[in-house]
UniProtKB/Swiss-Prot annotation:
The gene is dcd. Residues 165-176, 185-195 have a biased composition (Basic and acidic residues). This is dCTP deaminase, dUMP-forming. One of its GO terms (molecular function) is dCTP deaminase (dUMP-forming) activity. Pathway: Pyrimidine metabolism; dUMP biosynthesis; dUMP from dCTP: step 1/1. Keywords: Hydrolase, Nucleotide metabolism, Nucleotide-binding. Homotrimer. It comes from Halobacterium salinarum (strain ATCC 700922 / JCM 11081 / NRC-1).
Length: 195
């Protein structure tokens, strides 16, 4: 069951669902979602003369990623064909009986901006800022301003609370992230990790 605005507000008031800072409830809480705003930090992938990046080699992934922090009053220009990682301003804490889905806002979609490539699902137990996989599918650059409403979170109630939620007990790779995170796929079992 997808939570309505009434359900979202009740869960926020109870404190088991947290979205902070939620500075303008009337603006951000929609009929069946919550608009979240763009943070100031971005990870950009450098164009390099390499045949490929091996996801399981930390040095290769880290070598081709640079962080940009947008200052007050400035904007981040997302160029056609670019893919960058951004983050939400808000931290989100999802209780054991809910999942969240990251969806794009229609107004940005009409400018050819997408907010996630594949990672649009937030597990029960997640706590942190949401990493956004931003792309410009259009033909002209788009200026993104920190604190603009960039995406929406849709919450769905599980049939029962998760017995093994996302989090520290599972060694979850992205728990408590405070900004955009590059791939940590090297932590997966098939690459010698524990997950």
């Amino acid at each position: 069951m997808i939570l309505s605005d009434q359900d979202i507000l009740a869960r926020l008031a109870d404190g088991d669902l947290a979205i902070e800072p939620l500075e303008d409830v009337d603006l951000q809480v929609q009929p069946a979602s919550v608009d979240v705003r763009l943070g100031r930090r971005f990870l950009e992938f450098e164009r390099a003369n390499v045949p490929c990046i091996h996801p399981n080699r930390e040095d290769e992934v880290d070598e081709y990623v640079t962080e940009t922090v947008v200052e007050d009053g400035d904007e981040f220009i997302l160029h056609p064909g670019d893919f960058v990682l951004g983050t939400t301003k808000e931290r989100v804490e999802v209780p054991r009986d809910l999942v969240a889905q990251v969806e794009g806002r229609s107004s940005l979609g009409r400018l050819a901006v997408v907010v996630h490539a594949t990672a649009g699902f937030i597990d029960p137990g997640f706590n942190g800022r949401v990493t956004l996989e931003l792309s410009n599918l259009g033909k002209v650059p788009v200026a993104l301003t920190p604190e603009m409403r960039i995406s929406q979170l849709v919450f769905t109630e599980l049939t029962s609370p998760a017995d093994r939620p996302y989090g520290d007990e599972r060694g979850s790779k992205y728990q408590d992230q405070d900004g955009p995170q590059a791939s940590r796929i090297r932590g997966d079992r098939e690459f010698g990790g524990t997950q």
